[in-house]
């Protein structure tokens, strides 16, 4: 049986413990040996990042240097076009072949807006979705047809993620950390401490570069 590959996308502006810690817990829960982080270049659903792509890449490298679970994929950073998950997953599927189990990790907030994503209906053709639960967010989709879509693909058996190449949605019971990149940027702008929110090498780099001031 081929091992489950997992991808984790985002802006990471900057990367912080709210990104890394839930995914590390998830890896232990469902048996992931490698998670590939894919930073966006031009995110289609949010404003352009404050740190440029080179700076965000370097912060990620610093954050995962002592974490063998994680590896970095730069393909979206090398595009000048918007970073569409559907496109990236199609590329991965073509590279890995039809039989390798592949999953894309998202937060519960992203699940609720998932039907607005570019070619969202093709994503489950190429990968599973693993959703990190977040308190305060409902499990119901906004419209009945999307709720039906969720229920049609939902599984409560994590083994399905390993045995099938794509097509399932799994809601993972991961810890939630009240940390966001927005909070970190605001604290830095106000001269407040962020030592408990992100890895020390990342904070050192932010200060050296004068980011988010």
From Swiss-Prot:
InterPro entries associated with the record: Cyt_trans-like (IPR004821), NadD/NMNAT (IPR005248), Rossmann-like_a/b/a_fold (IPR014729)
GO BP term, pick one: NAD biosynthetic process
Pathway entry: Cofactor biosynthesis; NAD(+) biosynthesis; deamido-NAD(+) from nicotinate D-ribonucleotide: step 1/1
Enzyme Commission identifier(s): 2.7.7.18
GO molecular function: ATP binding; nicotinate-nucleotide adenylyltransferase activity
Catalytically driven reaction(s): nicotinate beta-D-ribonucleotide + ATP + H(+) = deamido-NAD(+) + diphosphate
Enzyme class: transferase
Domain of life where this protein originates: Bacteria
Pfam families per the UniProt record, alphabetical: CTP_transf_like (PF01467)
Residues annotated as signal peptide: none
Keywords per UniProt: ATP-binding, NAD, Nucleotide-binding, Nucleotidyltransferase, Pyridine nucleotide biosynthesis, Transferase
Disulfide bonds: none
Reported function: Catalyzes the reversible adenylation of nicotinate mononucleotide (NaMN) to nicotinic acid adenine dinucleotide (NaAD).
PANTHER family: NICOTINATE-NUCLEOTIDE ADENYLYLTRANSFERASE-RELATED (PTHR39321), PHOSPHOPANTETHEINE ADENYLYLTRANSFERASE (PTHR39321:SF3)
Similarity section: Belongs to the NadD family.
Protein name in the entry: Probable nicotinate-nucleotide adenylyltransferase
Species: Shigella boydii serotype 18 (strain CDC 3083-94 / BS512)
Gene: nadD
